[in-house]
């Protein structure tokens, strides 16, 4: 590598970026500036999302009042930027509105103490009270009721969707939620005209629900990366991802996009939703204006309206790898100046390694690419301190091979098991595996995480070999981040804390390497576990599965060393018990009589 040339390019880029893709002008009134940039509809939607993510228990109508107040104030500032209060920061304006809520202390307890602080501490305080698992009722779509609401007031319907999703997902990527709200309204526009509204609506809502949950999990991981491991972690992730998507783009261009994208995500994670959406729009414009040097796959995206354009760019397929790329070993193992180049600009050199590796390997997971970069960095730290560094680091690529082999072997083992057991059976196998590893974790969390992990089979094992690793590893990163977020709220296991906090990129290998916890003291047998009533018979299949899986976790917490045969016997007895009583004429009487018998047979089987 001509390192002097590279450093010159980097310095040139740094100078250019001081002007930036995003506008850096100062404005007399920030709220007026954002209102003019975003337009009234998007402004109101983003403000509604912001309030819903902070005040997750407030009724919709209360939020609408807050949104209308702030919107009217923004219009006043657009008309006259020197009007009293228009010069205040957005954090100050939002915080003042939150602190005016009469029921703040009664509904949110300690959160009300945030109002005694000054900015920026007040906003940090509000952020710390966001609840990743709020106690809110499940949303159960009733096609006829929803169509009536949609026809009565489309705007309110759109707002209600933003509110319901935002308060359940307090870190949802706000501009992306606007996109999904528009799509949601589009589904109702189509299906409420249909003869069979349910047949049209329900499959579309379910498909969309899966996409929304995945989008929420991706943003939660980004926010956790910044919160727990700093901006550098998110930048590294973005370098790998964008280098895979845009392999023809120069490293300096990728670095520029990464810096801007990190700023956008940092703003949204920090609750600065107006700035985040505005800057995301600017970034989409920049990418489209420069698509010739970024990717040949962008044209279709760039012809779309703003929200669809940004979504499309985020989801765009990977461009073809440029032809005749030199082997990686030339610059990163064979070159005798590797240590000199590394020590002169460590982050830039490692960034270029990650860029070059990622653009050549679209079939690798981002997390695997980051592990490779981390191991490469550790090798250079060790080798560059030796008398003959080149002899030490020249074989580094042989040492990195195991980091690719390990996930490939694990994926094969798990996909083989999935094909043998099916999704539900695979989930149960994971419940057994993870309950034995971390039995201190709450039963609902173990069930939720194991069910999600089990879906990786359906999602990824049917894909071609070239797509299996990114699908599996990156999906597992999202699920394990959910476990880490929930565990942080009520930490109960040192093993989980260690895996969650030591290294972001090594979380999955850390959890995979956990062994059954031999120090765990089993729970006493709880007869209430087998106290059921007739209402179980009318539950949807998914909820019935969750009931059975909850029982399985509790059995393992009582008898962690139960054999596969014992567990199989108990679960078969349990299923037979439910089936028998649900077929009985007097279901409630059957559950009352057969329940105690099941307790006895379970205790006998586990003895």
Curated annotation (Swiss-Prot):
Q: Give me the residues that bind Zn(2+), please.
A: 91, 270, 272
**Where would you say this protein principally sits, based on its record?**
secreted
Name the SUPFAM superfamilies on file: Serum albumin-like
Chain positions recorded as Ca(2+) 1 binding sites? 30, 267, 272, 275
Q: How is it modified after translation?
A: Phosphorylated by FAM20C in the extracellular medium.
**Where would one find the signal peptide in this protein?**
1-18
The family database entries (Gene3D superfamilies) matched by this protein are listed as: 1.10.246.10
N6-methyllysine occurs at which residues? 557
What Pfam families does the record tag this protein with?
A: Serum_albumin
Coiled-coil annotation reads none
Location comes to:
Secreted
Q: Which UniProt keywords apply?
A: Allergen, Calcium, Cleavage on pair of basic residues, Copper, Disulfide bond, Glycation, Glycoprotein, Lipid-binding, Metal-binding, Methylation, Phosphoprotein, Repeat, Secreted, Signal, Zinc
Q: Name one GO biological process term.
A: cellular response to starvation
Q: Which GO terms describe its cellular component?
A: cytoplasm; extracellular region; extracellular space; protein-containing complex
Question: Which cysteines does the record link by disulfide bonds?
Answer: 77-86, 99-115, 114-125, 147-192, 191-200, 223-269, 268-276, 288-302, 301-312, 339-384, 383-392, 415-461, 460-471, 484-500, 499-510, 537-582, 581-590
Pro-peptide positions on chain = 19-24
The residues listed in the UniProt record as binding Ca(2+) 2, with positions renumbered to this chain, are 37, 278, 282
Q: Where does the UniProt entry place glycosylation sites?
A: 151
Q: Which residues carry this modification: Phosphothreonine?
A: 107, 443, 445, 569
Q: How does it assemble?
A: Interacts with FCGRT; this interaction regulates ALB homeostasis. Interacts with TASOR. In plasma, occurs in a covalently-linked complex with chromophore-bound alpha-1-microglobulin; this interaction does not prevent fatty acid binding to ALB.
Record protein name field: Albumin
Q: Which organism is it from?
A: Bos taurus (Bovine)
